UniProtKB/Swiss-Prot annotation:
HAMAP family: DNA_HJ_migration_RuvA (MF_00031). Coiled coil: none annotated. Residues 65-138 are annotated as: Domain II. Has three domains with a flexible linker between the domains II and III and assumes an 'L' shape. Domain III is highly mobile and contacts RuvB. InterPro entries: DNA_helicase_Holl-junc_RuvA_I, Hlx-hairpin-Hlx_DNA-bd_motif, NA-bd_OB-fold, RuvA, RuvA_2-like, RuvA_C, RuvA_C_sf. It is found in: Cytoplasm. The lineage of its organism: Bacteria, Pseudomonadati, Pseudomonadota, Betaproteobacteria, Burkholderiales. This is Holliday junction branch migration complex subunit RuvA. It comes from Leptothrix cholodnii (strain ATCC 51168 / LMG 8142 / SP-6).
Length: 191
């Protein structure tokens, strides 16, 4: 399974990217929320991924935040919602908006997403109720490079949850190294 890609952003054409990792180009489908926050072509990018193996294809879906990927995976568990539909939902609504719509049972917000009809919207509300917790309703930290991704993973390994880890890396400089970043993040978490 491929859980994360770090490489050079070689091409981007909504909703697909080509990420060059060590001379191998990976095609990755992303929601528009991720697409709009990507660096310019030629820059390094780190994407958290979800790998789908089908009879006729192997597909990678990429996200800048762990929150978005977790929501995507939660959507895939719903009967009748495939990867394309889940991607469409996350392109039409932010994670916070989706969580709010589910909490308020607002089918009207979901119906505005292309490909989501009234019945599908009602099924989404029913099956997601109580499953998009408060952590998913909060915007996650955008992981801009491999060091920040490693810092988040280290904090999670030390027992912090994704929300705490994401909050701890937000104030860190983009060019901070892994060991210094972990120290700074731990200091911030200790306050």
């Amino acid at each position: 399974m491929i859980g994360r890609l770090t490489g050079t952003l070689a091409e981007k054409s909504p909703p697909q990217l080509l990420v060059d990792v060590g001379g191998v180009g990976y095609e990755v489908d992303v929601p528009m929320s991720t697409f709009y926050n990507l660096p310019v072509l030629g820059e390094r990018v780190t994407l958290l991924t979800h790998f789908v193996v089908r009879e006729d294809a192997q597909l990678l879906y990429g996200f800048l935040t762990a929150t978005e990927r977790a929501t995507f995976r939660q959507l895939l568990k719903i009967s009748g919602v495939g990867a394309r539909t889940a991607l469409s939902i996350l392109s039409g609504l932010s994670v916070a908006d989706l969580a709010q719509a589910v909490s308020a049972q607002e089918a009207g917000r979901l119906v505005k997403v292309p490909g989501i009809g009234k019945k599908t919207a009602e099924r989404l509300l029913l099956e997601l109720k109580g499953k998009l917790g408060p952590d998913l309703a909060l915007p996650g930290a955008v992981i801009r490079n491999e060091a920040q991704s490693d810092i988040v993973q280290a904090l999670i390994a030390l027992g912090y949850n994704e929300r705490e880890a994401a909050a701890a890396i937000k104030p860190l400089p983009a060019d901070v190294g892994v060991s210094d970043g972990i120290k700074l993040a731990l200091r911030a978490l200790g306050k």
